[in-house]
Amino acid sequence: MTSLPYRLGTGAVLKNSEGLVFAAQRIDNPEPAWQMPQGGIDKGEAPSQAVMRELLEEIGTDKALIIGQSNWLDYDLPEELVGKIWKGKYRGQRQKWFLMDFQGEDSDINIETEHPEFREWAWLPFPELIDLIVPFKRDLYRQIGMELG
């Protein structure tokens, strides 16, 4: 598995005016699997462009201002998922995370997009989110918290 490359991706730590972070529960996982918006970087796309596109695709709005960014952070998939996700081409993701200030209203958020990824969403304190995500991403989220606080 270690010979496989990382998929390049990006993610959004989207904070509202109360300092809470946007999180949503994945639609494709029967377990409570929450996460922040994230996704791949398309060829020729800058990470900052990708994160804005991902917001539109996943939560229906890009009303956000980038106010900070992380270093590149990696996570590995568990062995049993490597062959099931991304057609077995990647061992995990190398991501650039952006701290973003939400500039819209809650009514601007629409997770019922063309290709829905989430079943519900909430504004949460960042430390609570760590316990709600899939276990293999918890160290990544701790790193995000340390870098973007």
What are these language model-derived features?
Residues 35-36:
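A short gly/proline-enriched turn/hairpin at secondary-structure junctions
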Residues 42-135:
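Unchanged
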Residues 1-21, 40-43:
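Conserved N-terminal beta-strand and adjoining loop/helix that marks the start
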Residues 29-32:
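A conserved beta-turn-beta hairpin within the catalytic core of GNAT-like acetyltransferases
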Residues 139, 143-148:
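C-terminal alpha-helix
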Residues 15, 27, 53-57:
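Short alpha-helical scaffold segments that flank and stabilize functional sites
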